[in-house]
Each structure stands twice: as structure tokens, then as C-alpha cells.
Swiss-Prot record:
One of its GO terms (molecular function) is translation elongation factor activity. GO terms for cellular component: cytoplasm. This is Elongation factor G. It is found in: Cytoplasm. GO terms for biological process: ribosome disassembly. Keywords: Cytoplasm, Elongation factor, GTP-binding, Nucleotide-binding, Protein biosynthesis. Residues 10-295 form the tr-type G domain. Its main location: cytoplasm. GTP binds at residues 19-26, 91-95, 145-148. Belongs to the TRAFAC class translation factor GTPase superfamily. Classic translation factor GTPase family. EF-G/EF-2 subfamily.
Length: 709
């Protein structure tokens, strides 16, 4: 069935619900789905029955891991008429291990609802998600949730939006009562009160519009006056009228708020208690009143895949050629690979062929759905401005651009941090081995920050990701969804080795005579450190002249050296940063072979390496810590104790920002230590920066550990 409001982009909102963990965003989303008619029964996060948290782990842990996408409709009552709006919602995780899920959601949204805990106000992860939304230029409205909670303070929460986020709040509502007495909200635009009367079985679906309680009248007048001052300054005509008459109409106030919101000059603030079914409907009105439609955001800009210097822009209409961005992939038990896309321009139907310009491959679109959490609603076309799920695409990955074959475009892809933690996993039985390979391939397809590789020497499978919670959940999903039981090792650091001194004219002769055809290969080689900052490269040079080694054997020498480098020198870690030059050698007419020269290359390196001053390299992380000033001394002392070096200290809104470089091996458990040192008020991000030489005392410990001493 084709959905009935796809044609009018003004009536579509693509929004995200974003927050700190436990601020109540999944419950808020549940209420939205209930009041928009998508849900007949309200699911509670603490009961493990939430619609958006449809993975088993999410329902058990009460947190949101994957961004579920859903479509719902809201009838906005304006004056005497109702107008229907389509709202596409992405529910995003608030846990630090799942920042990739948040990043990719924000990349394709037009607006967002930032949910805050009414007692805590802005919390560390709220700041992280807010900064991510700033990065992608996403307009937001704020919903101060949990107003029924003990200690809830609306005015404190508004203040933290100013002080901690450096944002300008536009207070459009005031709470009526607080904690157990929270009963509703004052609408400062209409100057009316909305009161929920806790009718049994009503679940907050109906509320009364009344006069503002007498004890709030003065405060409402004061806050309305501040709101009108802010709104009037958004527009010269409004300012002129306001200065003349001292008043603005409801429509003018909403238009002014909308302009400020879309330009990200200010952020409307509303309040309620999603769990107690209060304040959600006016928040939905605010979503359609203030957040942008696909037409309000700038045209998407990409470039010509054949020539990156040529910019192309696509307007959000079906008249422009088809272009879309893949922002998520998940696995469905029946349909297989589900590809979530944001369509920016044009349209596509089931059965059409599109170009994946990122991979330069054609793909055929099978079915097209709009999702309601894990339920699929088929549609007969995917059109500009909307979010859909495609089935049938084979080789697509997150961040790919899909476009019209005849009008190719590449949209800016998404960047994800490199994994920072690695663990070994092994299947418990032989039968689990193949199932584990399939499971890991599918799971790494879904999450760009999760990677899988095999250790050549031990044959172990190593999985890496952004944190221990993420890897725990991967292992849990293998067990639940793919029925794979596996053992999991302890977290490990990805060390490397390199050489610091050149070894010239290293000779090696491989000779074997055991009846029948023998083996013979002689090489003369130089091994030098490569001048490379991150120690990641390898160079092979052939300087053999006079045909002393025939050309067919040269690649075998190269392969032998690389194979030996994989095995390490001191502690079995892969060697990087080596320039290998073969200068001379000797061939036997009968006994020389590719295998003989591969062995000669390998052994030549193995004999030279111990003389080349080998050292161990460790990954160094660029760490940014944002902390309130009072904890700065403790945080810096802790970084120094972890062999870290402080690079800079700067002021940000309400916090000190410390940039440091710290070895990854010292960062395990850091999040817990930082929380306890700062009472949970500091936050940090880290990403791979470079490799650096390990100090001698640490190197000795690593070598002993690798040898099992």
C-alpha cells in the first residue's frame, strides 16, 4: 500500500529521539507510537516489552542498542482543522559504546527531539550526542522528561542547557506541579493550561484545556514576555510589530520559533512525563510546528564519482534523479539483508536497478518497506524526503550511495572510529565453527565499528570493536540469533614490531638435496627502517642486475619476506615499517623454484631481523576528556599515571577540554575510573592516533607475557 502523505514533503518529518542513557527516550518513543495510533498496547522498557527495543538483549538490559526506524502519523489540530503529518522516527542508543549508531542516524535526519532527565538535566552522554548533532547541523527541540521524578526541577534543567551545552533555550511551556504533583503544562503561546486527570485506562490520551492556575499566572507572564522578546528578534517585521503593539499572534510566534529552530539559533523547551502519560501530545505538535520538513533543509550536495572536483546538488523532489544514502544494515530472519536508506531525491520502485556509486556496482531493488520497529509495511515506491528499507541488495554496506545509473552521484559517506579493543573468540564445538563464520560475517556487515580477522599463526578468530559492552552483545547475539556457542578471551591490544637499524648485505642460501629434484635459492638483501610516522608501511625493491635471479622468482622473495614479517621478531607481533631490497643472488637451472626463493626470502629476513634493533610498537590513542574544572587536577594526574602526555588544555562551555595521547593498553577500564573520579560528570572520546615505541620496561613485560613466562 502506498502511504497517503508521501507526495507533500511539507507534511513529512524525519526525526531522531536522542538522549543520555536512562533519560527515558525509548519510553517517550513508545508514547509517541501509542498516541499516533501505531500501538494498541503501551510497552514499558522496565517490563522488557518496548516496541522499539525489539532485540532480545535490548529488552533484557533496558537499553537501546540498534537504531530502530518507524513511521507514524499525527493529526495536528490547528484552529478549526486537522492536518495530517507523517513522522519517521529513529530511536538512537545513549550508551558510549554505540556512538556509531547515533552518528549514522543523525547523518540522515532533518531534526531531533533531545530528551533530558528532569532531575539530572544535561548529563555527559547528552553532551556527546548534542555535539554529534551539532556536527551534522541537526535542529532540535528539547523535552524535559521525568517531571514526576523525586527531585525533578524544570528550571535547573533549562539552566543546564545554557551552561553545559552553550545553547539558547526557548521556554515554550512551564510545568504545573512537580514530582508526584506533576499534573500538566502551561502553553506560553496560547496562555492555556493542559491538565491530565489520570483517568483509569485512558493512558493520557485525553487532557483538559483550562485557564492557567492562579499561582502560576505571574511566572507564565514573565516567561511569555521573555519568549516574545526572543521571537521578535528573529525577524525584522515581527520586531517592528512587537515594538508597536506589544503583542504577536499565535501563528506569528510559532513562525518565529520555527525560524529560530531551523537556523539552530535557539531550541524550544517542553516538559512532561512520558511514563506517566503527560505532555507527549503537545511535544508531537512541537515536532511538526518547529522541526524542518525535507524541503526546509538544504539540497544534498555530492560529487561526480568519476571526478571529485565536480560538485552536484540534488533537490528533495521526485523530478531530480534518484539518490539515497545507506545508513544502516540489519539481518531479518525471513527477508535476509535489510538495507535502511534515506532517499534525498527522485524515486525508485521495486524491481528497478540502481547504481551503488561507492562500489561501482549495479543492484536490483527487491521489495521496499517502511518499518515499524521490526514490522514491515510494503510500499510501491520510495520517494524523495523519506526513510525506507530495501530488500534484495547484495553487496551494499553502510555509508554507500545509491543513485540513478544515468546520473551518478557520490554523497559524503559516514566516518566511523577504528575499533580499540580486541578479543579472541573460539567455537565450543566443530559444528559451531561454520555457523560462527556466517554469524560474524553478518554481524560485521551490520556494524561498521565491529571487525573480524583471523590470526594467521594461532588460527584464532579475533573480533574488535568500540568497547566491551559492544563485544558482549555481539557474542550474545551469536548465541541467540545464530545458535553459536563460543568461548571468549580477555581484551587485547594490537601491538606491532619494527626495526630501528639497517642490516646490509644479508645473505641466505636455501639448499636441499634429498634424491630426485633438489631445492636451491640464494639471495643477498638489505633491510632498512622506513621513515614512516605511523609504522604501517612496507616497501620491496628489486635491484638485481645481470639476470642473476630470473624475474619470475622476485615476487616469491617478496612473499617470503612478508610472511616472515607477519610472525614477528621479539614477541610474535606483525612487523611494519621495513624497506626490503634484494640486490643479488643465484639461480640453479634445475633445482630453483618459486617455493625455494620464498623460503630464502623468509629466512633472510629472520636472520637479519635480530641484528636490526627490533622494538615493539603500541597503539597510541588521541584522547579528549571534557571535565568540570574542579576535577581537572585529578583527571590530569590520572592521565600522567597512564603514561599519557597532555597535548593541550582549552575552555569549552562550562567545561575544561584536555587533549592527550595515551597508550591503548593503559585505557582499559578508563571509563569506570573517570566516572568515579568525576562523579560521572566528565566524558571522553578516543580514537587511534599513531604507533609509538614501547618503553623498555614495558616491552620486557610484553615479551614475557607472550612467551608465557
Amino acid at each position: 500500500m502506498a502511504l497517503d502523505v508521501l507526495n507533500d514533503l511539507n507534511q513529512i518529518r524525519n526525526i531522531g529521539i536522542m538522549a543520555h542513557i536512562d533519560a527515558g527516550k525509548t519510553t517517550t518513543t513508545e508514547r509517541i507510537l501509542f498516541y499516533t495510533g501505531k500501538n494498541y498496547k503501551i510497552g514499558e522498557t522496565h517490563d522488557g516489552a518496548s516496541t522499539m527495543d525489539f532485540m532480545a538483549q535490548e529488552q533484557e538490559r533496558g537499553i537501546t542498542i540498534q537504531s530502530a526506524a518507524t513511521t507514524c502519523f499525527w493529526n495536528r489540530q490547528t484552529h478549526d482543522e486537522k492536518q495530517k503529518f507523517q513522522i519517521n522516527i529513529i530511536d538512537t542508543p545513549g550508551h558510549v559504546d554505540f556512538t556509531a549508531e547515533v552518528e549514522r542516524s543523525l547523518r540522515v535526519l532533518d531534526g531531533a527531539v533531545a530528551v533530558f532527565d528532569g532531575k539530572e538535566g544535561v548529563e555527559p552522554q547528552s553532551e556527546t550526542v548534542w555535539r554529534q548533532a551539532d556536527k551534522y547541523g541537526v535542529p532540535r527541540i528539547c523535552f524535559i522528561n521525568k517531571m514526576d521524578k523525586l527531585g525533578a526541577d524544570f528550571y535547573y534543567s533549562v539552566d543546564t542547557i545554557k551552561t553545559k551545552l552553550g545553547a539558547t533555550p526557548l521556554v515554550v511551556q512551564l510545568p504545573i506541579g512537580a514530582e508526584n504533583d506533576f499534573a500538566g503544562v502551561v502553553d506560553l503561546i496560547r496562555m492555556k493550561a493542559y491538565v491530565w486527570n489520570d483517568v483509569s485506562g485512558d493512558l493520557g490520551a485525553h487532557y483538559d484545556t483550562t485557564d492557567i492556575p492562579a499561582d502560576l499566572q505571574d511566572k507564565a507572564e514573565q516567561y511569555r514576555s521573555e519568549l516574545l522578546d526572543q521571537v521578535a528578534e528573529s525577524d525584522e517585521e515581527l520586531l517592528e510589530k512587537y515594538l508597536e503593539s506589544g503583542e504577536l499572534t499565535e501563528d506569528e510566534i510559532r513562525a518565529g520559533i520555527r525560524k529560530l529552530t531551523i537556523n539552530r539559533e535557539a531550541y524550544p523547551v517542553l516538559c512532561g512525563s512520558a511514563f506517566k502519560d503527560k505532555g507527549v501530545q503537545p511535544m508531537l505538535d512541537a515536532v511538526v510546528d518547529y522541526l524542518p520538513s525535507p524541503e526546509d533543509v538544504p539540497s544534498i550536495v555530492g560529487f561526480d564519482p568519476q571526478d571529485e572536483s565536480i560538485e552536484i546538488d540534488r533537490k528533495p523532489t521526485t523530478d531530480d534523479p534518484f539518490s539515497a544514502l545507506v545508513f544502516k544494515i540489519s539481518t531479518h530472519p525471513f527477508y535476509g539483508k535489510l538495507v535502511f536508506v534515506r532517499v534525498y531525491s527522485g524515486s525508485v520502485k521495486p524491481g528497478d536497478t540502481v547504481l551503488d556509486s561507492t562500489k561501482e556496482k549495479k543492484e536490483r531493488v527487491g521489495k521496499i518497506f517502511q518499518m515499524h520497529a521490526d514490522k514491515e509495511n510494503p510500499v510501491d515506491a520510495a520517494e524523495a524526503g523519506n526513510i525506507y528499507t530495501f530488500v534484495g541488495l547484495k553487496n551494499v554496506t553502510t555509508g554507500d550511495t545509491l543513485c540513478d545509473e544515468k546520473s551518478p552521484i557520490s554523497l559524503e559517506s559516514m566516518t566511523f572510529p577504528d575499533p580499540v579493543i580486541e578479543v579472541a573468540v573460539e567455537p565450543k564445538t566443530k559444528a559451531d565453527q561454520e555457523k560462527m563464520s556466517i554469524a560474524l560475517a553478518k554481524l560485521s556487515d551490520e556494524d561498521p565499528t565491529f571487525q573480524v580477522k583471523t590470526d594467521e599463526e594461532s588460527g584464532q578468530t579475533l573480533i574488535s570493536g568500540m568497547g566491551e559492552l559492544q563485544l558482549d552483545i555481539i557474542v550474545d547475539r551469536m548465541r541467540r540469533e545464530f545458535k553459536v556457542e563460543c568461548n571468549v578471551g580477555n581484551p587485547q591490544v594490537a601491538y606491532r614490531e619494527t626495526i630501528r637499524k639497517a642490516v646490509m648485505n644479508q645473505e641466505y642460501t636455501h639448499k636441499k638435496q634429498t634424491g630426485g629434484s633438489g631445492q636451491f635459492a640464494k639471495v643477498l638483501m638489505n633491510f632498512e627502517p622506513l621513515d614512516t610516522e605511523n609504522g604501517e608501511t612496507y616497501e620491496f625493491v628489486n635491484e638485481v642486475t645481470g639476470g642473476h635471479i630470473t624475474k619470475e622468482f622476485i615476487p616469491s622473495i617478496d612473499a617470503g619476506v612478508q610472511e616472515a614479517m607477519e610472525s614477528g621478531i621479539l614477541a610474535g607481533f606483525p612487523v611494519v615499517g621495513v624497506k626490503a631490497t634484494v640486490t643479488d643472488g643465484q639461480v640453479h637451472d634445475v633445482d630453483s623454484s618459486e617455493m625455494a626463493f620464498k623460503i630464502a626470502g623468509s629466512m633472510c629476513f629472520k636472520e637479519a631481523a635480530p641484528k636490526a634493533k627490533p622494538v615493539i610498537l603500541e597503539p597510541i590513542m588521541a584522547v579528549e576528556v571534557r571535565t568540570p574544572e574542579e576535577y581537572m587536577g585529578d583527571v590530569m594526574g590520572d592521565i600522567n599515571a597512564r603514561r599519557g602526555s597532555i597535548q593541550s588544555m582549552t575552555d569549552s562551555t562550562g567545561v575544561k577540554v584536555i587533549d592527550a595521547k595515551v597508550p591503548l593498553s593503559e585505557m582499559f577500564g578508563y571509563i569506570g575510573d573517570l566516572r568515579s573520579k568525576t562523579q560521572g560528570r566528565a566524558m571522553f572520546t578516543m580514537q587511534m592516533d599513531s604507533y609509538a615505541e614501547v618503553p623498555k620496561n614495558v616491552s620486557e613485560e610484553i615479551i614475557k607475557a607472550q612467551r608465557g613466562e
